[in-house]
C-alpha cells in the first residue's frame, strides 16, 4: 500500500484551544495514539482530509507531516466521527504503526470478471464487503480481488478459497462465505416474464398499426 502524506498541525500551531474553535477555523480535531508515546492532539485541514479519504479510503497508510516538517509519524486511521445528518467531520483518531511489525486491519473485497451465473439470471450476493488481514503495514493491499467469472448459480466463494497476496494472511477462525450466486426468486422470474410479455405486446401493436396503415393506402 502506498504511503499517503497528510499535513497536520499541533493544536497550539493551529491556534485553536478547543475542538469547537478548531472546527470554526476549518480544522478537524484529531489525536495520535502510540504504543510508547503520550497521545498527541492535532488539527487537520477539513478540505484536505476529505480529499485524502475520498482518494485513499479510511484504511490508508498515512505519513503525518507535523507543523511543516518539524516531526512526522506513520499512522492509520483508527476511528472517524461524523455528524449523522450533515456528515461533518467531528474528530479523528490515528494509531501510530511500526513499519517493521505486522498489524491486523480490514481491506475491501473487489470482484473481477463477469459472473456466469448472473448472465443466466442468478443474483450475485456480496456477503462480506471487507476481509480481515494481517501483514506488515507496507504490504496492506488496497483490496482483495476475487474472480467471479466462473461462478454459476448455486456456487459460492468461502474465505478459505481466496488466495491472498504474497506476505498477506487472511485472518479467520470460521470458513465463512464471502460471495454467493443465488437462484432468481419467483418474483424476479415473474417480473422478467411480465416485462417480456409487455415488450412482445408492444411489438405486436406496432406491427398491427403498420398493417392497417398499409391497408389504407
Swiss-Prot record:
One of its GO terms (biological process) is translation. Keywords: Ribonucleoprotein, Ribosomal protein, RNA-binding, rRNA-binding. GO terms for molecular function: 5S rRNA binding; structural constituent of ribosome. Pfam families: Ribosomal_L25p (PF01386), Ribosomal_TL5_C (PF14693). It comes from the Bacteria. Residues 185-217 are annotated as: Disordered. Residues 189-217 have a biased composition (Acidic residues). One of its GO terms (cellular component) is cytosolic large ribosomal subunit. CDD domains: Ribosomal_L25_TL5_CTC. The keyword Ribosomal protein applies. SUPFAM superfamilies: Ribosomal protein L25-like. Belongs to the bacterial ribosomal protein bL25 family. CTC subfamily. HAMAP family: Ribosomal_bL25_CTC (MF_01334). Part of the 50S ribosomal subunit; part of the 5S rRNA/L5/L18/L25 subcomplex. Contacts the 5S rRNA. Binds to the 5S rRNA independently of L5 and L18. This is Large ribosomal subunit protein bL25. It comes from Desulfosudis oleivorans (strain DSM 6200 / JCM 39069 / Hxd3) (Desulfococcus oleovorans). The gene is rplY.
